[in-house]
C-alpha cells in the first residue's frame, strides 16, 4: 500500500513543481473554502476522536491538542489563506553571476519533492503541512496519530476534493489512515519516494526516526524551554513574561517548563512569583531551598530530578535557584532541548553572554518563549520547529521546504 502511495506522490510532485504561484494560490483558496463549507463533517469526525481519547484516558493537555472547535477550524482556514499572501520562494535566484569562462550561473530555489510527516494528536498539522507543501510545489504523505485518525481522514478528503476541483492529482496530499504502527517503520524506509521526513511528536518518535529512517530527518518540536531571571531583572515585567510563557497555551512546545532564578533576587522574587502563579493555577516544583523561600498561595510540590528533563505541556513549572549566569547556562546545556530559552535582565553584558552561549534555535532577551512560531516570526504557518542545525533551524516556513539547483547558461561554452 505504502509503495503505491509513494509512486503516486512522486508523480504528483513533478506536476506540482511546474505550477505558477498564481495556480498554487488558487488551490489554497479552494482548500480554505472547502474547510469552511465542510466544517460540520470535520467537527463530527473530531468529536468522535475526542470522545475516544477521553475514554482512553488521555491527559487534558493531549485532549486540548486534539480538539477542534468552529473557531479553531475557522482559524485554520484563515491560516491557509494567509499562506497565499506569502512570497513563493520557488524559482527565486539565490545567487549567481557570469563566470570567467563565459558561463552564466544561477543557484535557484526548487521544491524538495515529496515530504513525509509523522505527527501525533494535532489535527491542525494536517492542514498546516499540506498548505505549506503545496505552496512550495511539494507533495506530502501524512501519518497522523491514531488519536486523530478520523479527523485527519475527513480533512484530507476535503483537501483532495479541492485538488481535484483545480485539476491536480489527489495524490499530492495523502494520509496513511491505517493506525497500524508497523506502517511507520515501513514509511521510514521509503527513501526511494520521500525526500525529507519530519517527525512531530515525543522523544520516542524522534529516537525511532533518527535510528531507523533511511530518509533525511528533521527533528524538533520537543521544548524543555527555560527562562533565566537574572539578579538585575525588573520584577513586574518578569512576572508578566513568565505568566505569558507558561499559561497562554501550556500544551505548546514553546511554553516555558523551567524557571532559573538567580540567588541574589530569589528572596524578593519567589514570594511574588508564588502569588502570581496561584492566580494562574500553576503548580510549582521546587527543591527544599526553593520551597523555604517560595512562601505564598501557589501549590508547591517537591522537585524530582528527572522532572528537569520533562516537557510538562501542562500548568506545571520547575523552579531552580542558580548561583550566577554560568550556572544558568550550564543548566540549560544539560537539560534543554535547544528549542527556545530566554533571559530576563537589565544587564546587557549578561544578555549578550546568554545570546552567544545558549545554543538554542531561538534565544530571547526580556521576551516570552511563546514567540517561537512561524506566524509570529512572519513566516506564515509552520511545518515544524527544528531543533537541529541541518537543513533548517527554528520555525520551518516555506524556504525550509525547498532546496536549490545550479543552472548554467552557455553559448557553446566548454571548459578549458
Curated annotation (Swiss-Prot):
Major site of localization recorded for this protein: cytoplasm
Known catalytic reactions: L-glutamate 5-semialdehyde + phosphate + NADP(+) = L-glutamyl 5-phosphate + NADPH + H(+)
Keywords: Amino-acid biosynthesis, Cytoplasm, NADP, Oxidoreductase, Proline biosynthesis
CDD domains from the UniProt entry: ALDH_F18-19_ProA-GPR
Compartments (UniProt record): Cytoplasm
HAMAP family, alphabetized: ProA
Pathway: Amino-acid biosynthesis; L-proline biosynthesis; L-glutamate 5-semialdehyde from L-glutamate: step 2/2
GO MF entries: glutamate-5-semialdehyde dehydrogenase activity; NADP binding
Family per record: Belongs to the gamma-glutamyl phosphate reductase family.
UniProt name for this protein: Gamma-glutamyl phosphate reductase
GO terms under biological process: L-proline biosynthetic process
Biological function: Catalyzes the NADPH-dependent reduction of L-glutamate 5-phosphate into L-glutamate 5-semialdehyde and phosphate. The product spontaneously undergoes cyclization to form 1-pyrroline-5-carboxylate.
Native source species: Salmonella arizonae (strain ATCC BAA-731 / CDC346-86 / RSK2980)
Family matches, as SUPFAM superfamilies: ALDH-like
EC number: 1.2.1.41
PROSITE patterns from the UniProt entry: PROA (PS01223)
One Pfam family of this chain: Aldedh
Gene Ontology CC terms, in alphabetical order: cytoplasm
Flavoprotein listed as a keyword: no
Amino acid at each position: 500500500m505504502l509503495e503505491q502511495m509513494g509512486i503516486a506522490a512522486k508523480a504528483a510532485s513533478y506536476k506540482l513543481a511546474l505550477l505558477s504561484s498564481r495556480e498554487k494560490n488558487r488551490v489554497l483558496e479552494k482548500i480554505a473554502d472547502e474547510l469552511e463549507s465542510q466544517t460540520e463533517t470535520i467537527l463530527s469526525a473530531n468529536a468522535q476522536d475526542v470522545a475516544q481519547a477521553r475514554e482512553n484516558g488521555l491527559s487534558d493537555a493531549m485532549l486540548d491538542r486534539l480538539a477542534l472547535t468552529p473557531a479553531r477550524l475557522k482559524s485554520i482556514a484563515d491560516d491557509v489563506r494567509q499562506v497565499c499572501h506569502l512570497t513563493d520562494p520557488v524559482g527565486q535566484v539565490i545567487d549567481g553571476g557570469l563566470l570567467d569562462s563565459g558561463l552564466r550561473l544561477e543557484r535557484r530555489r526548487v521544491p524538495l519533492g515529496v515530504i513525509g510527516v509523522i505527527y501525533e494528536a494535532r489535527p491542525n498539522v494536517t492542514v498546516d503541512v499540506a498548505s505549506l507543501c503545496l505552496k512550495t510545489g511539494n507533495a506530502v504523505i501524512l501519518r497522523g496519530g491514531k488519536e486523530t485518525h478520523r479527523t485527519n481522514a475527513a480533512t484530507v478528503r476535503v483537501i483532495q476534493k479541492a485538488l481535484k476541483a483545480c485539476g491536480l492529482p489527489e495524490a499530492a496530499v495523502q494520509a496513511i489512515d491505517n493506525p497500524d504502527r508497523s506502517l511507520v517503520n515501513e514509511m521510514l524506509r521509503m527513501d526511494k519516494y520521500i525526500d525529507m521526513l519530519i517527525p512531530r511528536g515525543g522523544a520516542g518518535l524522534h529516537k525511532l526516526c533518527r535510528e531507523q529512517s533511511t530518509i533525511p530527518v528533521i527533528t524538533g518540536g520537543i521544548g524543555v524551554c527555560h527562562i533565566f531571571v537574572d539578579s538585575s531583572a525588573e520584577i513586574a515585567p518578569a512576572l508578566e513574561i513568565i505568566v505569558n510563557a507558561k499559561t497562554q497555551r501550556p500544551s505548546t512546545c514553546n511554553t516555558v517548563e523551567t524557571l532559573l532564578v538567580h540567588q541574589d533576587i530569589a528572596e524578593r522574587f519567589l514570594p511574588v512569583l508564588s502569588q502570581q502563579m496561584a492566580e494562574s493555577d500553576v503548580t510549582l516544583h521546587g527543591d527544599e531551598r526553593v520551597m523555604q523561600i517560595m512562601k505564598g498561595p501557589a501549590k508547591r510540590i517537591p522537585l524530582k530530578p528527572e522532572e528537569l528533563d520533562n516537557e510538562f505541556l501542562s500548568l506545571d513549572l520547575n523552579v531552580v535557584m542558580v548561583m550566577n549566569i554560568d550556572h544558568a547556562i550550564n543548566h540549560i546545556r544539560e537539560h534543554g532541548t535547544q528549542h527556545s530559552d530566554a533571559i530576563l535582565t537589565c544587564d546587557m553584558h549578561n544578555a549578550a553572554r546568554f545570546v552567544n552561549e545558549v545554543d538554542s534555535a531561538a534565544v530571547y532577551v526580556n521576551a516570552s518563549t511563546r514567540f517561537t512560531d512561524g506566524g509570529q516570526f512572519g513566516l506564515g504557518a509552520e511545518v515544524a520547529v527544528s531543533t537541529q542545525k541541518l537543513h533548517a533551524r527554528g520555525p520551518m516556513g516555506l524556504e525550509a521546504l525547498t532546496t536549490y539547483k545550479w543552472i548554467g547558461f552557455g553559448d557553446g561554452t566548454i571548459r578549458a
